[in-house]
Amino acid sequence: MKSVTRLANLFRPTHYDLSITLHREARTFEGVVTIQGELFVDDEIRLHSKGLTIHSALIDGKEAALSHDPHDELVLLQQGLIRGSHVIVVSFSGGITDTMNGVYPCYFEVNGEKKEVLATQFESHYARQAFPCIDEPEAKATFDVTLTTEKNITVLGNMPIASQREENGALVTTFETTPIMSSYLVAWVAGELQKKTATTKDGVEVSVWATHAQTPGSLDFALDTAVHCIEFFNDYFGVPYPLPKSDHVALPDFSAGAMENWGLITYREIALLVDPEVTTLSAKQYAATVIAHELSHQWFGNLVTMKWWNDLWLNESFANMMEYVAIDALHPDWNIWLDHAAGEVISALRRDSLDGVQAIQTDVHHPDQISSIFDPSIVYAKGGRLLRMLQAYMGDDDFRTGLTSYFTKH
């Protein structure tokens, strides 16, 4: 497969100001994105854009000509454009689809009434389906996000709400500015939700959200687990959780187990909610390890991010290991490492015995190859086990010192 050009080498955003209006019933959205960044070539600026209709584009306040490249690229042309700092403004629109990536609806019923929640899934390269951007992990920037939605619903983003107002019969929600982050970690959820909230001893507000189709008691275990996991990782890593809040949202429709969007983690309902009336120990263990895995990603992947997808193991292998470290500390009576040895380790050994199996670190030349490297037996289980061996060889104190240095330097 032909390698694609890495656009972050041509133009590097430093800040996005993104404003999107969601039309849930019409299954469309429109928006304007202002991108500040540094151009490293002359004559053109290339952005990722897929399935979007581009209405206009300005570079430094002057109209730019538009063209499209086959590789999800929007090309902005302007006579006399030279390398250096520039401000781009792009007006666009797109569709809300049932693909469970980009911007998509989740369906549920309450007392026989059909309802929907709108959510996003941008990993690995689906942010480009929601707004023009440099949709590569190393192109980290800050984001200001404003969403215009229908009234009388909950609207969540990566950061706490900075302001919210009603305007022309709609709800306008503006979020606080994010730290520098990759486009695949941007997220929002909009719909009728219930929540339960607690605060860590360091003042991080933790909330678990679900639709009203779920019983309120099913949120309790997740909330307790999330609070204690954040407190554990703060101590273990020696680097505090970087955001003021941590939202955990159970979605009725979700393509994976969970997604570590910074400050707004989304889950399949079974991976977050535990009904105390009917649950089993294995269900609690599954939810606990998924929550710990995603919270570990708030450091591994979100705070420190791989430059490109060939180093996905830096995200997933560490998170796989740390989910067990955390849950073993919180629930030593579960003997969770025995489950790891009997399940994931055996899976890794079986997968690794096959001819042609991928390595933990695998070259990726095209976005279409990314999904194939999310191999649970290799990048997750084998990589996690190797790191567990490294921890045992180094000793836990030195291992933790190394992690603190890793987070601090990168």
Predicted features, each with a name:
Residues M1-K245, I270, D275, D375-I378, ...:
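Acidic/His-enriched low-complexity segments
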Residues F175, S207-H410:
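Hydrophobic alpha-helical and helix-loop surface patches within well-folded domains
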